[in-house]
Amino acid sequence: CGGGLRRIGEDVTESLDYVPGRFKVVRHVREAFACRACEQVVQAPAPHHAVPRGRAGPGLLAHIAVAKFDDHLPLYRQAEIYARDGVDLATSTLSGWLGATAAAVMPLVDLLRRGVIAGSDVLHGDDTPVPVLAPGTGKTTTGRLWTYVRDERTHGGARPPAAVFFASPDRRGERPLAHLARFSGVLVADGYAGFNGLYAGTRPGGALTEAACWAHVRRKFFDVHAATGSTLAAEALARIGALYGIERGLHGKP
């Protein structure tokens, strides 16, 4: 009608959008000064780089590592993605940066491993197969990722939960022997024969105490019962369930 308007409220509409990651060049300018009397030159030191004489910042290095190991994105695919953004990075360059990143964080990894393995009374251990591409062959081999977990929340312990990982090209029993060389205590694990050397009296440092994993034991009875309806397997499942009930009642208590 042409009359004046007054605000009476508002409606808000939201939508989810995505802003792709962007590269940026961080430029550090370090001015140099010379003493008028003695000509001595002073200048702030160059910023630290995780990659010696490299041009990758910490954010980019972290992104490459997470994309590779957490998102399972091979370096050649990362290179293709970065090229779409106008940044050409050879896979050999990315590989070198990744190796330098691993070297830079290794002291923290070693500290975590010592704290978890040597500083724990009870550990949970397991391994999982990992396909590994064999360079130059186009084929994959089966490596192993070993995980050792400390979690004292079940019995009211004071130490925080933590996990450490080791990678190996195979599943030989010498692997857990080396991983747990500094550990002394109880190991909760499945019945894999490769762990048996840890429970042997001939183990340097003494035998570990074996605590078999009930979840793995239960799985065998569950499979038999599902396939055959065995009453014996059903009885075993019921008894294991009763043990689980006791554990739930004790959870978190010292």
Model-predicted segments: where are they?
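Catalytic center-proximal scaffold of phosphoryl-transfer enzymes
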Residues: 6, 27-34, 39-254
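Charged, often Cys/His-bearing segments associated with DNA-binding zinc-finger transcription factors
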Residues: 1-32
